[in-house]
Regions:
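Bacterial N-terminal signal peptides
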Residues: 5-17
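Histidine-/acidic-rich catalytic cores in large beta-rich domains
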Residues: 22-299
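N-terminal secretory signal peptides that target proteins for export/translocation
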Residues: 1-2
Length: 299
């Protein structure tokens, strides 16, 4: 069944893109933002599309549609695919407390996680049938803090950040845990990089770490590295093709930095600020200086 929702276009809002004075060129990005407000924004700061519901995670699909994990209201949340015209062409409704992640898969399935008394990771078909179900070994006392941005990785396994457990685990499809790493604070993202390392944002720990296959931290950045304090609840992250990392400050107030891009040498080269009351929970950087981010987004 096709469901139509209202979509707003070109909503003006103040933003600032800041580059350090010693950088040779200005950096611009267009991006998808998910959180209390859900929208696409171009590199000039113009909102080109929006969705009238709060979301946790989302992707711009090759066909131009948006795949979104919708925050719960009085239900268990949902996953929707919505066109730029606001037509919902796919919906999978959650059956427990909430749905906290979504990922489109190459085989056409959609990955999602359900939080609740039976925390689980699912692959569902476009017909809404469950093709894969993986039980997640997580605490049950706080459903909201069970998991966040789970991802299927190249070897067919699943990386799952488990917030309150302070651990990132790699599960096989049969539920067996084949790798894990303890984290210094609640992990939000677990991004398996091409070199085999894993990039992890540690939310209220206000830090980002990169660990190798043995769990050793090989790179770390936090508020301790800057005279200003850009970290303010490090939720979503994305590793760009140039090696830089974009990080969200989910709890940032209006007028404060909501997103920032940091180099391997811990230099901030781009920031995004707006006057919205809603924070950015996660995001997808779509281009840099007008050049589309090619390949699989590392987010």
């Amino acid at each position: 069944m096709l469901i139509r929702v209202a979509v707003l276009f070109a909503i003006p809002i103040l933003f600032i893109s800041v580059v350090r004075a010693d950088d040779p060129a200005k950096i611009t990005h267009s991006f998808l933002a998910t959180g209390g407000e859900t929208y696409l924004q171009d590199s000039e700061g113009k909102v080109t599309w929006s969705f009238p519901k709060s979301t946790r995670d989302g992707w711009v699909l090759p066909n131009g549609n948006l795949l979104l994990a919708v925050s719960k209201s009085n239900d268990g949340g949902s996953v929707v695919e919505v066109t730029r015209e606001g037509k919902i062409v796919f919906e999978f409704k959650g059956t427990q407390a909430e749905i906290n992640t979504v990922q489109p898969l190459p085989n056409g399935h959609i990955l999602l996680t359900e939080a609740g008394d039976n925390p689980r990771l699912l692959e569902v078909t476009r017909e809404g049938k469950i093709a894969v179900e993986v039980s997640i070994q997580a605490q049950r006392k706080d459903h909201h803090l069970q998991t966040r941005m789970a991802r299927k990785i190249a070897n067919g396994n699943y990386l799952v950040p488990q917030l309150l457990d302070k651990v990132v685990r790699e599960y096989q499809a049969d539920g067996k845990i084949v790798w894990e790493v303890a984290t210094p604070n609640w992990p939000f993202t677990a991004i398996r990089l091409d070199n085999g390392n894993t990039l992890i944002n540690c939310t209220i720990g206000n830090m980002t770490i990169e660990v190798d296959k043995d769990g050793k931290t090989v790179w770390q950045v936090s508020n301790d590295d800057f005279p200003v304090k850009p970290f303010d609840d490090a939720c979503g992250a994305q590793r760009l093709p140039n090696g830089n990392t974009v990080i969200t400050a989910y709890h940032a107030k209006p007028g404060k930095t909501k997103l920032f891009e940091v180099t391997r040498e811990k230099q901030i080269v781009w920031t995004y600020t707006d006057q919205r009351g809603a924070g950015i929970h996660h995001f997808q950087i779509l281009d840099t200086n007008g050049k589309e981010i090619a390949g699989r987004p590392l987010r």
